[in-house]
Amino acid sequence: MKIGVLGKITKVKSQQVIDELVEFLRSLGYETQMFTAPQEIQGVDVVIVLGGDGAILHSAVPAARNNVKIIGINYGNLGFLTE
């Protein structure tokens, strides 16, 4: 299974979390790919989106076009969609 990871890497803490998540997934034997923008989502079975509701919403259309499932992890303020 190929897993993509998408999150805002403009913050140092976010980059650290993304790096740790990718390392963990690879240690379990998953092929991983990091994305920096929703438009890049393709070539994976699932994308893990770290962010708030806006990140999930922006990722929905590109993911759907490429038949990619979304797993959301709330890293924002509201988190309604990741609840």
Question: What does each model-identified segment do?
Answer:
Residues 36-83:
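Small-residue-rich beta-alpha loop regions that form the catalytic core of phosphotransfer
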